């Protein structure tokens, strides 16, 4: 049943939800990097930046670190294809596990690793151990897109000083790096330190800036068969962002780098979208070499991440964005449909010409006019009105604690056994604050979206019934405030053995996940189910995989791998409308994941070839997102459940030795990642907290962010 709107409005909301389910994201950055052993690559060849690597919550970005000593395709594809935003096998980054000293670093809510955690620490991430999905891992059962373990022990870095200075025309324009390491000293101590600074007063895109300081300090003491190492690092960053616009705006601005997020205030440039990101982290690792064939590694990790992203918003007035569709020429006159007589009148043509002249005639006209917004707010304040325009900030903070312990054993000369446990807990705090009132004198914690449906004295317009009509000043919370609590633990093991020409590997993992919401505001749309803690959702996890490799001789090697897992859904998709209530998504289930791979390798003195074929199938996938629906002035929260997905394709890599000084390298991939069924969609909007259900006809729609 649709919410109680006029029929025309119901139809628009329904169409918007279905369109959202149909269309993959218009823009999703997908960067990968080479994860070879670091010494083989010059640092200047490829550098991560936060904007490339997915710490911007405004976009869906997926970065995959892959590498292999045995698979030439996996060893090179991330680095070589990164400029075209290639995503390994079309897989979401949550299927790629990133570890530091054996501790899993992927975010416990989203499952993804945020590369801003190690931003600027290129030298520190050079000591890496990579595994593919069906290889033997010493720190976990490898995920479907493989994994990597970074070694942050101070003694692992080469002794000496290293200074690097660089200039670039990307998000930052200047970069300086200083690294110092003692190496392992005769006393058994080792110290490593790194300092990186990246800066841009203006990035490549106008209206952007960048300011980031990265630091690392590691200390290690080796005594007898034991080693204790401690490392702490962080990457405090302040940067502004660029916004995607339409072809119409790019055409009139005469630039594909037009950025609608900035404008002039007192004659100076100001960006409305500014990100502040800082996640200080520390890890303590104990290594115990029990015997020459047995080693125990235990690590304790802690991190407190603080992420804030600002945005220009408005209240009971027109949208101030300069590229808002209602002020663009195309909203007045239809230049494409000659039969649309209503929008092809002389008056409409005149409006089109006026809008075109306004937008294209002056740079200031196509940017945010902060001075005008401040003036409007001051006039409203004189009349006793709340802020019409303001800068809000969304916060995603998290406190993470993790423990990992792994035993690595050489059972015989031809067999190895690895097993271990991981425990972790995460408290994610999500809230909104008033960043800048832009000259206004007052603002109140009222759901202005709902005022078109309910009167001012109705409880349902209150964001917090525990503090009705709460006054909001700069720095105060408003709109929503809640925590997501996640705890997880699992046991893993893998065993590998050589048997003549055969090599076998088996791995297994079992554990559980618990998740819960803790609301800090009693929302008027859900007064009984928004304040305080929700119930707890529990999910068991179980999985196994195996591979068999045959060395046929004369350089020919064939390998086959397959696995099946039950994986818990992510907490970031588990709640139907987390900004409003404690409700879990209906039909929330474990993902069922089948993965398989067949590969062939040939290697001789002048030719090296890798050919891989893969097929993966996912069942009971849950996806969640929210969006602003302009026609009804409301945010909508959308959950898709029961999704099935398939990923399949072939990969080819070849290196031909043309001469002693020249190699020809070929790399290619052809694959598919898509939905294989229509899903159930359940949605609600912020103006009337009732749910509607539909069928989303998403079968054969391709994975978002892929070609």
Regions found by a protein language model. Name each.
Residues 66, 72-74, 103-134, 151-153, ...:
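Short acidic/polar hinge/loop motifs at secondary-structure boundaries
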